[in-house]
């Protein structure tokens, strides 16, 4: 588990709200019937949604689990006003068009979208569970339906003595990391207005995830093997055996079922973080460039690799309306950094250049590149993705605003392990930490511990050197 300021990041086993009377929200019988009768939609499934649904179905067919839920929570003072919470939850669901869709998957890989036509047909109703234990509360969250069912999202509150905990559990098919800002801010602001005796808060208009799916489909259909973006992705993948890169150390047998575990190590304290940023700036890079350079230098120390190939996510929202929209907009940027014989400054500049020049590649789904290629393959299990979270940038900055001070925000995975090894580099005022979510087995635990120790050594040597000497 990782705790930074008011934010906790971990798995569902780390979530520990004060136990008490619990209320969850789920679809009414009428809404469920309406959804089951929803017509087939001509809105294309986004590449991110398709990848997630296929991944879930393929892993399930192998007898393996698949991490699919994004769980967020926050605390509110006092006794929960269930009527107000009910209004806010239903307003949220009707506001965002992604919640109107559900999906069907057939054996040949085709995915069909069905969409509720009238958002007013969506109705979630409170279910009063009474006093529950912590394992029972977690079970409610864990049992959120899978992405092939409408209503693969659940909401609820757990009442404590002087406060209550609000939670949302949403399948990844409908959300990305901005769930922490969109969902929690909407609940917090709208609920506060209602219990304060005010009229329902008028939020800025949300955008349309359906529109994004159409734009992505139109754009992707124009791509060919000769498109510069496709050629860039192809060159990257050819450097990593025709697919995404592998983690530098063994992680156990990916064909064996595994839960997820998370380990966190503080890389730099507040002073060292400032020193590290100064070294990055002197090298002509930003903090993210320095982070990616350190990842590359750590891999060089562990394996002797001469070139670092990495992946880092990027939100592709571009407009104010997009920023208010629930959905999966996040793509991946491929990073290539020559490492052998490089001083940190050289590596940081190269990483920054690769990041900046690759930003637009996040709008090009790798799955589309594979469709166009005769040589590339889909990602292998346990490919690593480096997530950089900065207190000064979204989505983390949204959670550190004055409005959410004291709300004890939590962001959790469902404790299942899927296909991707997630590395989180988190920079806050107090310092810089790295958390790794990995398959919970002895081989992976040993490898992740070794990786984090090496990465910390690189970070600290850079910060303490105060110059761009070779730290590899």
Swiss-Prot record:
Biological process, per Gene Ontology: glycolipid biosynthetic process; trehalose metabolic process
GO CC annotation: membrane
Pfam families in the cross-refs: Condensation
Gene3D superfamilies attached to this UniProt entry: Chloramphenicol acetyltransferase-like domain (3.30.559.10), Nonribosomal peptide synthetase, condensation domain (3.30.559.30)
GO molecular function terms listed in the Swiss-Prot or TrEMBL record: palmitoyltransferase activity
Top-level enzyme category: transferase
Disulfide bonds: none
Reactions catalysed, as given in the entry: a long-chain fatty acyl-CoA + alpha,alpha-trehalose = a 2-O-(long-chain fatty acyl)-alpha,alpha-trehalose + CoA; a mycolipenoyl-CoA + a 2-O-(long-chain fatty acyl)-alpha,alpha-trehalose = a 2-O-(long-chain fatty acyl)-3-O-mycolipenoyl-trehalose + CoA; alpha,alpha-trehalose + hexadecanoyl-CoA = 2-O-hexadecanoyl-alpha,alpha-trehalose + CoA; 2-O-hexadecanoyl-alpha,alpha-trehalose + hexadecanoyl-CoA = 2-O,3-O-dihexadecanoyl-alpha,alpha-trehalose + CoA
Enzyme Commission numbers on file: 2.3.1.278, 2.3.1.279
Observed phenotype of the null mutant: Deletion of the gene prevents PAT synthesis.
Keywords: Acyltransferase, Transferase
UniProt family annotation: Belongs to the PapA acyltransferase family.
Physiological role: Involved in the biosynthesis of polyacyltrehalose (PAT), a pentaacylated, trehalose-based glycolipid that could have a role in anchoring the bacterial capsule. Catalyzes the sequential transfer of two palmitoyl groups onto a single glucose residue of trehalose generating the diacylated product 2,3-diacyltrehalose (trehalose dipalmitate). Although palmitoyl-CoA (PCoA) seems to be the physiological acyl donor, PapA3 can also use docosanoyl (22-carbon saturated fatty acid) coenzyme A as acyl donor.
Protein name as annotated: Acyltransferase PapA3
């Amino acid at each position: 588990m990782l705790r930074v300021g008011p934010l906790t990041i971990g798995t569902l086993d780390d979530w520990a709200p004060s136990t008490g009377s619990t209320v969850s929200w789920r679809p009414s019988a009428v809404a469920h019937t309406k959804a089951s009768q929803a017509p087939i939609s001509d809105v294309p499934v986004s590449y991110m949604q398709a990848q997630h649904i296929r991944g879930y179905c393929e892993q399930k067919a192998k007898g393996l689990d698949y991490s699919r839920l994004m769980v967020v929570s926050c605390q509110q003072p006092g006794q929960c006003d269930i009527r107000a919470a009910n209004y806010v939850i239903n307003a949220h669901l009707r506001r965002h068009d992604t919640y109107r869709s559900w999906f069907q998957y057939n054996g040949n890989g085709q995915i069909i979208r069905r969409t509720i036509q009238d958002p007013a047909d969506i109705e979630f109703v409170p279910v009063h569970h009474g006093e529950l234990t912590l394992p029972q509360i977690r079970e409610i969250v864990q049992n959120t339906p899978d992405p092939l069912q409408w209503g693969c999202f659940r909401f609820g509150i757990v009442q404590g003595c002087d406060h209550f905990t609000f939670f949302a559990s949403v399948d990844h098919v409908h959300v990305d990391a901005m769930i922490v800002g969109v969902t929690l801010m909407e609940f917090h602001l709208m609920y506060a207005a209602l219990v304060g005796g005010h009229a329902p808060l008028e939020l800025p208009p949300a955008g349309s995830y359906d529109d994004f799916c159409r734009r992505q489909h139109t754009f992707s259909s124009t791509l060919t093997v000769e498109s510069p973006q496709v050629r860039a992705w192809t060159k990257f993948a050819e450097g990593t055996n025709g697919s995404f890169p592998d983690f530098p150390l063994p992680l156990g047998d990916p064909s064996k079922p595994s839960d997820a575990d998370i380990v966190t190590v503080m890389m730099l304290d507040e002073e060292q973080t400032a020193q590290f940023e100064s070294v990055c700036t002197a090298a002509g890079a930003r903090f993210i460039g320095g982070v990616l350079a350190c990842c590359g230098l750590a891999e060089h120390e562990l394996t002797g690799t001469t070139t670092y190939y990495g992946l880092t996510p990027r939100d592709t929202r571009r407009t104010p309306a997009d920023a208010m929209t629930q959905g999966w907009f996040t793509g991946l940027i491929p990073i290539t950094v020559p490492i052998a014989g490089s001083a940190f400054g050289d590596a940081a500049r190269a990483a920054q250049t690769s990041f900046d020049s690759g930003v637009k590649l996040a709008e090009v789904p790798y799955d589309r590149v594979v469709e166009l290629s005769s040589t590339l393959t889909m990602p292998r299990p346990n490919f690593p993705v480096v997530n950089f979270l900065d207190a000064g940038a979204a989505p983390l900055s949204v959670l550190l605003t004055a409005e959410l001070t004291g709300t004890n925000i939590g962001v959790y995975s469902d404790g299942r392990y899927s296909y991707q090894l997630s590395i989180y580099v988190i920079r806050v005022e107090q310092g810089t930490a790295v958390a790794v979510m990995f398959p919970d087995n002895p081989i992976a635990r040993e490898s992740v511990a070794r990786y984090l120790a090496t990465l910390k050594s690189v970070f600290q040597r850079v910060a303490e050197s105060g110059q761009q000497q070779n730290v590899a």
